[in-house]
Amino acid sequence: HDNLTLSVTLKSDASIRNQVVASVAKALKCSPAFPEDYESLKKAFRNPKLQMVSFTITEKGYATAPKYVQDDIPKGPEKCSTVICMVTALALERFKAGAFPFAFVSMDNCSHNGEKLQKGVMEVANAWKKLGFVDDGFIEYLSNPEKVSFPWSMIDKITPRPDGGVAKMLSSLGFEDTEVVVTGKNTWIAPFVNSEECEYLVIEDSFPNGRPRLEESGIYMTDRDT
């Protein structure tokens, strides 16, 4: 779908607003199994101008306790395949390129999300240090909030899985290819997203390399205490 998504907002007055979301410039597979895509991501992380990397990978994505993550850690930064290991490997790329500052921003709807992301990254990095893959300098880089920050955020927007009724409504309007697909992992995907009207996103304003003007998009920027 050319990285386009149709946002279907179900409003409180029973009306519906359809809007094409065209903010995704490019989609890449974050995995060494796809070397061309992965090299593009490495290049992005080596860019001194990179300001933030955001996450919506669910709370489970930050965990290091599962066996598949524990089995992945000893493979090291060059051969790992789990999300938390790969993002740590990409941070290592940035460290090696010049230890440039940036922010890792979790936008998953869970309490202390930035802390969970930081914990996962640090656990992987410390394990790699014990295994000889990284040195103290990398640990110090990740531990310095003036270099790498892990802002907390809070989001509220009910976005249920794609609804068959919405798909039929879109088809009646002439919108093509509305099929809802259920993957082998029971993930529901579709070329549209149906959601409620009420929404907000609050982010801790901790960005060591600067940030886009997020407040101009309606995002609330504040400190952690607030």
Summary of predicted features, one role per range:
Residues 1-226:
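Substrate/ligand-engaging "lid" and interaction regions
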